[in-house]
Amino acid sequence: MISKQKGTYDLYGEEARKVLALRNIFENIMNNFNYSFIRTPVFESTELFKRTSGETSDVVSKEMYEFKDKKDRSLALRPEGTASVARCFIENKLYTDLPRKFWYFEPMYRYDRPQKGRYREHFQFGCEAYGSNDARVDAEIISIPYHLFETLGLEGVKVRINTLGDNESRENYKKALVDYLKPHIDSLCEDCKERFNKNPLRILDCKVDKDNEILKNIPKTIDYLNEESKTFFDEVLSYLDSLEICYEVDPKTIRGLDYYTHTVFEIEANIKDFGAQNVLCAGGRYNNLVENLDGPATPAVGFGLGSERLLLALEHENIDIALTKSVDVYVIPMTSDKSFSFSLVYLLRTLGLSVETDYLNRKLANNFKYAEKINAKYTVVIGEDEIEKEYFTVKNMKTREEEKVSKNEFLKYILEHLEQDDCSCSCDCGEDDCDKGCDCHDCSCF
C-alpha cells in the first residue's frame, strides 16, 4: 500500500467541514475589510525566496523544498506567501493602481520536523496591503487576525509588538548588536556564528540559543530608532489603543525573515498547556521588499497564520466551528426503474436544495436509518403505487409525520415546508404548536 508522505495529512469528513467553516469565516471578515482574493503558483523560482527570506534564514537554508525541472531550472515549493504575492504584484504591474489589498488561503511547504499542529504541507491564511505608509494600515492588519480570534471565541488574545525601524534605524541597531555579541561569539551555536557574519539579526530568532543568557540581555531595537521611526511606532500603538486592542511592546519579538522593517508582531491567545503554540499569527511591515525584487519602491504590510495550529487551538478550547451537515431531502426509490426518481433528485438539486438518494438498493427500513444518519430533514418514498397514483409519501424526519402529497403539489409543498422549518420568527398566539403559516405568526419569511 502506498501511504501519504511524512508531514502531510488527508482532509475529509468532520475535519474538512471545520476547514471550510474557518475559510468562510475568514473570507467574510476579509470582505468586510475590503480585501481581494489572490492566488499564486505553488512553485516559484528558488531565487525568489533567496532574495526575500534571505539565504541565511532557516526557511531557505534548511526548510525549503528545492528541485530541478527537466530544463535544469532551480524551483522551490512555496514556503510562505508574502514573496509570491510581491512577485505577482511586480510582474503584473499592480503598482499602477494603489492601494492594493489581498488575502489568500494557500498550501505552503517546509521541510520541518512534523509535530501536532505543524506539518510539512500546511495551509496558511494571509493578508498583504500595498501602497501606504500610514500607521493606520499597520493597525488594520493587526486588527484582522485579532478580530478573527475573538470572533472564534478564543480568550486572552494579545498582540506582542516591536519595531525594527527604517533602514537607518535597522543599521544602527545591527551595529550595536554586533558590538554586543562580538565578545560572546564562542558561546553561540554554530549556525549563529555563521549568522553573525552574514546577518546578525537572525541570531535573535535562533531556536537553539533561545535560552542563552547572552541573548537575554541584548540591546533593544527601540533604543536605536531615529525620530521618524519612533514617531511612526508611537502612531501604530496609538491606533491600536483606539481600537481597544490588547498589546504588549516586546523587544524580543523579531521576525525571522530579511524583508521586515518597522512594525513586527505576533498574536497569541491564552490556551492552557498549549506551550509555544500559543502564538497563532505573525506579520509586520516590509517597505523594502518590492524594491528588492526590482519593482518600484512600495510600502507594504501583512501577516500569515496557519490554519492547522488555529484549528488545534479551537479543539483544545472545545470550540466547534463546523456546521452540522444536513440534507434537505432524501429520495428513496422503491421501483425497479429508477429513472423517474433519479430525474426528481436532479430537479430538486437544480432548485438549490441539498438532496441525496439511495444508490445501494437498501430495504425501506435501512433507508430510513440512513436518512437519520445523514440528518435528512425530509424523506420522499417513490414506489410502484406512488408512480401509478401520482403521489409521493413525504416524511418529516423530525416530527415523524407522514403525508401523501400529489405529484403536482410536491414541489410547492417541499419548498414551503423547508422554508417554514428554517424560520425562527416569533408567533403572537403563544401556542407552541402554532402553524408558522398562520395569520398570527409574526414572520417576514413568507
Task: State each model region's role.
Residues 435:
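Intrinsically disordered, low-complexity terminal tails/loops enriched in metal-binding residues
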Residues 1-429, 438-446:
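TRNA-recognition modules of translation machinery and tRNA-sensing kinases, especially anticodon-binding
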